[in-house]
Amino acid sequence: MSASRAAELRKRLNHYAHSYHTLDTSLVSDAEYDRLFRELQSLEAADPTLISADSPTHRVGGAILEGFEKVRHRVAMLSLDNAFSAQDLVEFHRRVQEGLAESVVVEAVQHYQDEYGLSDLGALVGRPGALEGVARDVTQRLNQTLSFVEPLQPPDTKSLLSSGRKAADILRRLRLWAAEQPQRVEYVAEPKLDGLAFSLTYAEGVLVRAATRGDGQEGEDVTAHARTIQDVPLRLQGAGYPALLEVRGEVYMPLATFEKLNAEARERGEKTFANPRNAAAGSLRQLDPKITASRGLRMFCYGTGYVEGGTLADRYAEILAALKGWGLRVSPEAERVEGAQGCLAYTERLGEKRETLPYEIDGAVLKVDSQRLRERLGFVARAPRWAMAFKFPATEESTTVQAIDLQVGRTGVITPVARLEPVAVGGVTVTNATLHNFLELARKDVRVGDRVIVRRAGDVIPEVVRVIPRESHGALAVYKEPVACPVCGAPTEREGGETALRCSGGLTCRAQVKEGVKHFASRKAMNIEGLGDKLVALLMQAGLVERISDLYRLHEQRQVLVGLERLGGKSVANLLEAIEQSKAQSAARFLFGLGIRDVGVTLAGSLAAHFTSLDALMAATVEDLVGIEDVGEVVARRVVHFFAQAHHGAELAALRALGVAAAGEPWRVEPDGHGVAAAEQPLSGLSVVLTGTLAGLTREAAAVRLEGLGAKVVASVSGKTGCLVCGESAGSKLAKAQKAGVPVLDEAALEGLFRGEIPPEIQARMQG
């Protein structure tokens, strides 16, 4: 009974996991999955003989290893030749065409030799050059060629050998024929992930081994670690797979996971990873698989290696479809394209999309689609002739640190910034790079004059990765942490346990005021269109803005504004209109705009929903605030401290007197002031947490749409949470939701919520 139940649980759990992680479809609630998982764990603990290689309980990580065993690849994991320009791709396509046309000629001649015993004819073939055309169906064309050639041979075959002219004529006609074939080659194009290549071996559908690429001939056994990666099926789905199947793929770390991992390391004062590739490699090669399990690695499959006891399709695109059907994750960006122009168009599209992807890529891989044509093209040295890696501009480059400047942020954080000798990184000229904080600067020991590696990826601010070792480094001056604010001269301070160094000047510091005004006017706050960085700086230089409330006095200075550089009458009119309109913004936007430390968009909404007015919030105690969902004691103390400061009280009174609605009027219940009664909205009473990276829109955009439908978007998961919307690279919130029995929705279900399609299990949790 236990054995059959364990087998049933394994089958169901693996099916649910495949549906969730590969197909992005949740078939059961996370609470139900968790219950079945615990049941299987209990059965296996009671009877270890029930544990099988495909048990999902293996994903949590096993015992710590003493080292990695070497593994010999049965089929070498070769590298690819690189292309760096459009011309390189055109040349690659031309070489493919020539190679295929040549293979037709050589095979035709070889067949002719074998048929008639002409052992010396091959010497006349040599290696035909510059043949244009391609053999789309080699066998059919060979037959066509032979039917064309055979009438040319004389009755006495030996006389052909004595006639170089006749043999040369045959070869000429063969080459002409090959050149006249349709010029059509299909490729499959895929993103080139910047991760770690490895292989998975399945015996009768069960994962039996995983190995890193290593040197291509020999890698390391990482089977225990691969089992912890959710994208790696422990047992293949469906049927039709070979008895022994080796799958090739790339392990990578999503960008959001990488940033989170490094942020946590910085907080602990530990060494950070230079890039997601290093993070993925370091995570996979941990001796303790439990560490690997905690790192959130993902995988895409891109082909097969050794196959036994079965056959695969001729077309690579069909092989990818088969792999997906067997439960393996393949890139949704893969496309079948035709010819050089198809390859070029794909790389352009992928390049435009590169910075929106949730993982890092460094190019595209282009492979001839037909396996038969691949065999005819063969290999050269270490790489196949039928594939090419097109490389995007590098995201890391070396340059020189010319200076280290200090920036003071809205909350007083002082950030060291390296001023660099201009360098092109990823197609963008970089002149500045963050050093994050002074503890990180000291750990990397960056000095003015150093040669450094600078990294830029996606929307991430360029950063100094490391110093390039040189003898001159020791002679350079060590950069010392400042004891006073570089702008206002106030003493610097560091709160207990924090890595950030702060200016203690508060609103007496012009740098903090400038950043505070920019934040107040930003899109997610009061949304004052046209009031950006340069204009705020201009207004402060002119003495027109010294604090936030001065924005609402600018209408008194219209003539002065018109006279400012880069401002005309129309621009001033538009600016003043935008400022006037901002007076009606919602309480949530107003609170976020105040810049209270640790009060983001979501928490500002929670405070606005809980209190009836600004006066009520200002009178709240720490105990009052801690009772609100998403508010912890640290944040509560910061909110109370903010409103207790006299200069903040004076500023809020000024905003009230100047007509800013949220500063003086009772707060409305409906989200973001849309003017619709909450009870009439389809998602009224539903609290939603967003986590991970969404493919179709940002989390902020999703939050706005949900709030517009009456939902309350909160920051953390609790037993009262209505649902968790989970994108790619979800973190600890997913595990917490599963533990609390909170329904988990994918992006497709989120779109359903936007349409008012509410699943029954979520309707039951709505408190409207």
Curated annotation (Swiss-Prot):
Keywords: DNA damage, DNA repair, DNA replication, Ligase, Magnesium, Manganese, Metal-binding, NAD, Zinc
Required cofactor(s): Mg(2+); Mn(2+)
Top-level taxon of the source organism: Bacteria
Gene Ontology terms for molecular function: DNA binding; DNA ligase (NAD+) activity; metal ion binding
Active site residues according to the UniProt entry: 192
Keyword DNA repair: yes
Signal peptide feature range: none
Domain BRCT: 678-767
Membrane-spanning residues: none
UniProt-listed Gene3D superfamilies: 5' to 3' exonuclease, C-terminal subdomain, 6.20.10.30, BRCT domain, DNA ligase/mRNA capping enzyme, Helix hairpin bin, Nucleic acid-binding proteins
SUPFAM superfamilies linked: BRCT domain, DNA ligase/mRNA capping enzyme, catalytic domain, Nucleic acid-binding proteins, RuvA domain 2-like
Entries under Pfam families matching the protein: BRCT, DNA_ligase_aden, DNA_ligase_OB, DNA_ligase_ZBD, HHH_2
EC assignment: 6.5.1.2
UniProt-listed SMART domains: BRCT, HhH1, LIGANc
Gene Ontology terms describing biological process: DNA repair; DNA replication
HAMAP family according to UniProt: DNA_ligase_A
Known role: DNA ligase that catalyzes the formation of phosphodiester linkages between 5'-phosphoryl and 3'-hydroxyl groups in double-stranded DNA using NAD as a coenzyme and as the energy source for the reaction. It is essential for DNA replication and repair of damaged DNA.
Protein name, per record: DNA ligase
Lineage, top ranks: Bacteria, Pseudomonadati, Pseudomonadota, Alphaproteobacteria, Magnetococcales
Gene name as annotated: ligA
